[in-house]
Structures are given as structure tokens and as C-alpha cells.
A protein has these predicted regions:
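N-terminal, polar/charged subdomain of small-to-medium soluble alpha/beta proteins
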Residues: 1-84, 100-142
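Conserved acidic
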Residues: 97
Length: 142
């Protein structure tokens, strides 16, 4: 999930672990069992190239503008709520699978020249953001 923001931060265990000041992207990354490095790289590139910002020549991407990205893992994106009142997380990949793929997303963005801040994988996090628009989009790379 991608959000266009005017600033965002993530705290874990009462510590600020990632922050972007001003315009940029908040990328909430969920990983499922069938995801791999290829999907992680495509997600990073698609997010950074998505034209969500106004520029002098029309709509431009975070990559065009050199904007920062806050990457936060979020297994709850794969919640299954079809039965009952209690979500299940069976579709979310386990930590040993998901953590390196979230790192691939961040590394791919850095390779593109983005300033990347991250959350702390597996921690209870508090994410604060100013959603601009609001623009919130579910990205799918399959």
C-alpha cells in the first residue's frame, strides 16, 4: 500500500526509528507466501515511478522529484476477515520469509537514489503520517 504524504514517522519501543520530513511516500509492505525478490524489486520500482505528484510538466513520480520513502512492514495487509469477527493471518508470510523481502524493497529504492527510512521489522510500531490528498493506493505487482 502506498500513501502520498507530507511527512511520516515510525516509532518502535518508544524510539523514533524512521522519519521523512516533507513530501514523500509511505510504503506499507505486506508479504505473502508466494512473494520473492522479483516481486519485492518490482514493488519498489512501481511505487517510486508511480506519478502521484504535481510537477511543472504534469504528474510526476517520487523518483522524478527525488522524494524520500518510509518503508514499513505490515503483515496485517494479508488479514482474512471472511469468517467471523477475528481476522486470520494465514496468508501473511512468516517473519523469516518476509523480513528479507521487505529489506529488498528498501535496498532497491536506495539503489534508485531514494532516501529511505524504515520501521523495525517485527516490532510493535506506531506510524504517524500526514496523508496528502488523501492519496492511498493498493499496489499489486502480480
Amino acid at each position: 500500500m502506498i500513501q502520498r504524504v507530507d511527512g511520516a514517522r515510525v516509532d518502535a519501543d518508544d524510539d523514533e526509528v524512521g522519519v521523512i520530513d516533507g513530501p514523500g511516500l509511505l510504503l506499507l509492505v505486506g508479504v505473502t507466501h508466494t512473494d520473492g525478490e522479483s516481486q519485492a524489486r518490482r514493488l519498489a520500482n512501481k511505487a517510486y515511478d508511480m506519478r502521484l505528484f504535481d510537477g511543472d510538466s504534469g504528474e510526476v513520480s517520487a523518483g522524478d522529484l527525488g522524494l524520500p520513502v518510509l518503508v514499513v512492514s505490515q503483515f496485517t495487509l494479508y488479514a482474512d476477515t471472511r469468517k467471523g469477527r477475528r481476522p486470520t493471518w494465514d496468508a501473511a508470510a512468516p517473519g523469516p520469509v518476509a523480513e528479507p523481502l521487505v529489506a529488498v524493497v528498501a535496498d532497491e529504492l536506495r539503489a534508485r537514489g531514494a532516501h529511505v527510512a524504515t520501521g523495525r521489522f517485527g516490532a510493535h510500531m506506531r506510524v504517524s503520517l500526514v496523508n496528502d490528498g488523501p492519496v492511498t493506493i493498493v499496489l499489486d505487482v502480480d
